[in-house]
């Protein structure tokens, strides 16, 4: 699903009006009907005190139409207010102003004294400003926004929380509605993906109001939203006559003394994500744990002294961390993909291991956790990252890789720049995890929940991605499928248990169910 700019959204409306064809006032009525139907399906009740705050543009026209429809449906306490922030409203706004006046009326807000009391048990429908806003709310509009935010009432925003820019970050001092739910039309807006805007957008729902899909699909944009339909179009089905060799051999390099659990989680996730064979390379201290925890995986550890002599190498032996002694005897080319980093530590031995791994293996890898921290500390090894690799930092790890950023949009630019410079896919983990490709595209994930913000969740993602790479997916597609499936499994776990109570192992347990929806 493409994420369009405010200008593209205006052109989309215009194209739909001209080519459907449909009158703009009819399109506004369609949007109001859709939103009203959604609101009455569990969000509001007939006896609620509903306060609708309208601007004088088309967003305000939507609000006036919603007020009229609710009154016509028998809602008992609907009050509509028009904030006089302009001399004249849009044509469709004025048409709906007349329609509402004929059945119920409204009041104007021109001064602070005219702002109505907003009880904490009221429901506010925010239709003040829409996606076309290009300057900060000020004057009476800002005063109304602050009054709504201070009221404690439940707030539902129409299309975009009023005061929020569609395509760029706001200033910290801007007056912006803090919505509980935002009902947006056609597709999410870029601003919904910014972490700093979570306090304003709340949860959002996308409503289809029949805007032209042909026009939307023809638009060029670097931003997209990963949905179930996206994954359904790119995920492969397993062939009747396929065998384990068809689905690749994944190797997970993970764990250290006290952190073998990271390896258990990554390997367990890889086993549940479709790879034909899964091997793991762990320190000696993790051998028995891995053998008993993941019997389906093949476990490799440190070369013995005879192997050292056979390969004519002399290495320091380390039972607690991966080091050079763990890699020289392995034929890495037999692996279809390698995932590295969870729990390996950042000691000198770990650095030498990672450097040697990058020298010996030139296929795309999944690079996470401590491997990213090692890369951040050594420019030499940063230049050695195999092209096409998938890097999976959380914000702290990403900051160590690229430095500080000024705002959420700047962070996305740094993510895209790093992906292009190094020829890698960067998966920046968090709410609406973003996937940046070397070609400059950025995809945002639609699945996942705050319950997944716990230790081990990232290790699970590493295993999922490594398994998908092993199956022959391109790095970009592996990343898109991986973050979606990972989040979907977390959603299933939270639904069965709770966001508070789920742990990383619960995500692994639900991976098969997440994949099942595509079979």
What are these regions (language model features)?
Residues 96-97, 122-127, 333-342:
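Small/polar-residue-rich loop-to-helix segments that shape phosphate-bearing ligand pockets
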Residues 121-123, 128-221:
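Internal gly/pro-rich beta-alpha loop/helix module
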Residues 1-82, 90, 192-365, 373-391, ...:
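Small-residue (G/A/S/T)-rich helix-start motifs and N-terminal tracts that mark the onset
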Residues 65-121:
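Gly/Ser-rich phosphate-binding catalytic loop and adjacent alpha/beta segment
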Residues 58-61, 86, 133, 162:
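Phosphate/ribose-phosphate-bearing ligand recognition and processing surfaces
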Residues 97, 141-145, 179, 354, ...:
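Amphipathic alpha-helical segments in well-structured domains
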Residues 81, 139-161, 360-378:
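Short, acidic/small-residue loops that bind anionic groups at enzyme active sites
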């Amino acid at each position: 699903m493409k994420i369009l700019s405010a200008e593209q959204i205006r052109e989309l409306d215009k194209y739909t009006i001209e080519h459907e064809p449909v009158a703009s006032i009819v399109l506004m009525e369609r949007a109001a009907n859709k939103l009203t139907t959604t609101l009455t399906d569990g969000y509001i009740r007939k006896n609620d005190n509903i306060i609708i705050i309208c601007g004088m543009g088309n967003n305000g026209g939507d609000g006036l139409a919603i007020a009229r429809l609710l009154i016509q449906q028998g809602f008992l306490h609907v009050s509509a207010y028009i904030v006089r922030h302009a001399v004249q409203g849009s044509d469709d706004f004025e048409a709906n102003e007349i329609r509402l006046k004929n059945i119920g009326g409204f009041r104007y807000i021109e001064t602070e004294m005219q702002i109505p009391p907003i009880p904490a048990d009221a429901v506010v429908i925010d239709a003040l400003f829409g996606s076309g806003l290009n300057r900060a709310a000020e004057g009476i509009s800002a005063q109304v926004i602050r009054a709504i935010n201070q009221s404690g009432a439940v707030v539902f925003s129409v299309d975009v929380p009023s005061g929020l820019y569609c395509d760029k970050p706001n200033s910290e001092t801007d007056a912006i509605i803090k919505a509980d739910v935002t009902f947006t039309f056609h597709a999410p807006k870029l601003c919904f993906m910014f972490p700093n805007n979570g306090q304003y957008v709340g949860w959002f729902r996308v409503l289809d109001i029949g805007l032209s899909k042909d026009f939307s699909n023809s638009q060029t944009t670097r931003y997209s939203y990963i949905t179930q339909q996206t994954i359904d179009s790119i995920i492969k089905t397993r062939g009747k006559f396929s065998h384990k060799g068809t689905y690749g051999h994944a190797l997970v390099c993970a764990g250290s003394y006290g952190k073998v659990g990271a390896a258990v989680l990554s390997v367990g996730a890889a086993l549940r994500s479709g790879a034909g064979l899964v091997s793991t390379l762990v320190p000696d201290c993790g051998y028995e744990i891995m053998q008993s925890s993941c019997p389906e995986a093949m476990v490799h550890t440190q070369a013995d002294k005879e192997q050292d002599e056979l390969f004519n190498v002399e290495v320091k032996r380390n039972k607690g961390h991966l080091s050079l002694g763990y890699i020289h005897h392995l034929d890495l080319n037999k692996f279809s993909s390698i995932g590295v980093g969870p729990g390996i530590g950042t000691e000198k031995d770990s650095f030498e291991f990672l450097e040697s791994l990058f020298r010996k293996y030139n296929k795309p890898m999944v690079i996470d956790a401590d491997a990213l921290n090692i890369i951040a500390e050594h420019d030499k090894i940063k230049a050695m990252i195999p092209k096409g690799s998938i890097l999976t930092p959380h914000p702290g790890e990403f900051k160590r890789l690229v430095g500080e950023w000024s705002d959420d949009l700047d962070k996305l630019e740094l993510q895209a720049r790093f992906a292009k410079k190094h020829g890698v896919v960067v998966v920046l983990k968090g709410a609406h995890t973003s996937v940046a490709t070397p070609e400059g595209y950025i995809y945002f994930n639609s699945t996942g929940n705050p319950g997944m913000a716990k230790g081990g969740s990232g290790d699970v993602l590493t295993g999922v991605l490594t398994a998908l790479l092993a199956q022959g997916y391109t790095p970009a597609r592996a990343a898109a499928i991986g973050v979606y499936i990972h989040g979907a499994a977390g959603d299933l776990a939270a639904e069965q248990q709770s966001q508070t109570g789920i742990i990383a192992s619960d995500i692994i347990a639900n991976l098969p169910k997440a994949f099942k929806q595509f079979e």
